[in-house]
Amino acid sequence: MRALWIVAVLLVGVEGSLVEFETLMMKIAGRSGISYYSSYGCYCGAGGQGWPQDASDRCCFEHDCCYAKLTGCDPTTDVYTYRQEDGEIVCGEDDPCGTQICECDKAAAICFRNSMDTYDYKYLQFSPENCQGESQPC
């Protein structure tokens, strides 16, 4: 319970869809994006370069690519809505940017869920020095 309280306090300063993304991660993947993916491999967390280290890191790479394709949207501050219907997440259609961001986040959460068996703790807190070289194109 104390851990949940700490996470809640940390999220107070986080704006926009980052909060929604964490909630989607918990609903779809059943684990915290902050705890497991905020600093994982070469692409999970801030920045990203080189080649994804495993399937979980590839989810982050694809998520970054999805965000990069958005025009006129800011995934860090734009908020979105979604609902659950018959166990499926349905992104709200009230805002075009919000819908696109939600779809990116939903795809990433599904990807993380599907790649849990490849998660390797050796890539948690992975040094950026290991991510040198040319980045893979989206």
From Swiss-Prot:
Residues 79-82, 119-124 form a propeptide. Expressed by the venom gland. GO terms for biological process: arachidonate secretion; lipid catabolic process; negative regulation of T cell proliferation; phospholipid metabolic process. InterPro entries: PLipase_A2, PLipase_A2_Asp_AS, PLipase_A2_dom, PLipase_A2_dom_sf, PLipase_A2_His_AS. Belongs to the phospholipase A2 family. Group II subfamily. D49 sub-subfamily. Heterodimer of one of the acidic (CA1, CA2, CA3 or CA4) and one of the basic (CBa1, CBa2, CBb, CBc or CBd) subunits; non-covalently linked. The acidic subunit is non-toxic, without enzymatic activity and comprises 3 peptides that are cross-linked by 5 disulfide bridges. The basic subunit is toxic, has phospholipase A2 activity and is composed of a single chain. This is Phospholipase A2 homolog crotoxin acid subunit CA.
